[in-house]
Amino acid sequence: MPLLSDAIERSGAVLDRISGDAPISGIDDDTRTVSEGDLFVCMPSDSRDTHELIPEALGKGAAAVLAHSQEGFQGAVEQGVPAMLSRKETGRFEDAVWRLAAEVLGRPSRKIRVVGVTGTNGKTTTAWLVREALMALGHPAAYLGTLGIQTPAGSRELANTTPFPIALQKLLCEVVESGATHLAMEVSSHALEQRRADGVEFDVGVFTNLTQDHLDFHGSMDSYASAKRRLFLELPRHTSKRFVAVLNKDDREGAAIESLVQGQVLTYGFQHGEIRGRADRVELDRLTLSLEHGADRATLEAQLGGAFNVTNCLSAAAGLVALGIDLMSATRGLAQARPVPGRFEAVRNEKGIGIIVDYAHTPDALTKLLGSVRGLKPKRIITVFGCGGDRDKAKRPLMAQAVCAQSDAVVVTSDNPRTEDPEAIIADIERGIEPTCRAVRVTDRRAAIQRAISMAERGDVVVIAGKGHENYQIIGKTKVPMDDRELARKALEGLN
């Protein structure tokens, strides 16, 4: 086992104080899973002083402690254990954690090729498509993000789109152990701001777009954009890999990032970019896209519907090309990609009613989603949507405006209310609803979906937005089983 002192030196972690030394075999910040020989990290918490957990961690065999306060450090020293101090007020604690986590766990991201995808919309679909295409082309690949972790060895859900540093490094080890050679992962703005992904050595970073979201966390669009830029401007400094920035040049922020990146850049778009796309045909559950890159030409027949998925396919193709895969092969792999669960997912039926379940939960995502549906020329669009509780309140009326602008009828309901009053959330939404918008309030989501489908006639499309693949609803702090797709099927059964 390596010595703690050696791990500190190799990691480049800057610490305020160090006392003692010991062999280290792992790292953990959870007393439920800490093991013999681990470095136990006392992560700052609003709910308790995590230094109080040191005795429990030591009782389970922890060999050393990383503290974030002088008192915590001194307490660890007094218990006779090697300890380190990185005061959280210096702003270096998060840096020390990701550096030590990556080093102690053997820098797993160096052993695979990693594609990181960031942007307001399209992260999940783009990352999913990259993984699906790689698998189709014979490359064992993994996915990590909103849909959980999927490796050649299996899959499961995750609590965060991009987990915290220690958990993330352990997941990377899991990816390596599964036999995967590639990983496509979503990189959220929260994770970039909180330095969660700094210990990941990316080969490729894909930028999809930037529109309003998460302003409750970031405070402003400038701060939000700055967080996204870290994937392209700061994280490449932490790796010896040849990093390629893949940027949507049709998006103003993508063009701005291009002007700042020092390394290799590959741009894509429909109007601008090295890789160009053109939508030839878009249907409810399939699309045709023409692609060109230099002298190369290819046509993609994808098993996805909706105009916005044309952009996602283009993003994924660009990411694959950045990995060194030629355009024709990338297209062949993408043609075999399975549809993404809960992303423009059609609920098929014999009633002649189109039903789409989608995760769209921002004004821009809803605009693109409903624009895609409108492009299919339905008789009417009936939209069911709500807004998540304990999240950005400023976007609620904007989401209403986006929905009303492109829907013939609207059913406003609950999403994941969490600890907020569902009626108060809907009241915020209704501030964006003009008198001309044909909208009704049905707070219970089950009843709302049933109401929307009962209103539908042959040739109409019912769009159920906001939760997508989720098979639960969060009420308070409890996850209650609920699946929009199943609710839609049950509502269809009740039609005459």
Predicted regions and their residues:
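Active-site beta-alpha connecting loops in nucleotide-dependent enzymes
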Residues: 45-48, 339-342, 364-435, 445, ...
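Acidic, Mg2+-coordinating active-site environments of NTP-dependent enzymes
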Residues: 7, 67, 72-76, 178, ...
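N-terminal leader/targeting and accessory segments in enzymes
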Residues: 1-99, 103, 276, 301, ...
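Phosphate-binding loop of NTP-binding sites
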Residues: 8, 92-249, 255-261, 376-377
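Glycine/aspartate-rich loop-and-adjacent alpha/beta segment that forms the canonical ThDP
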Residues: 461-494
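Short glycine-rich anion-binding loops that position phosphate/pyrophosphate groups of nucleotides
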Residues: 45-47, 189-190, 212-213, 251-252, ...
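C-terminal helical cap/extension that packs against the catalytic core
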Residues: 3-6, 10, 65, 69-73, ...
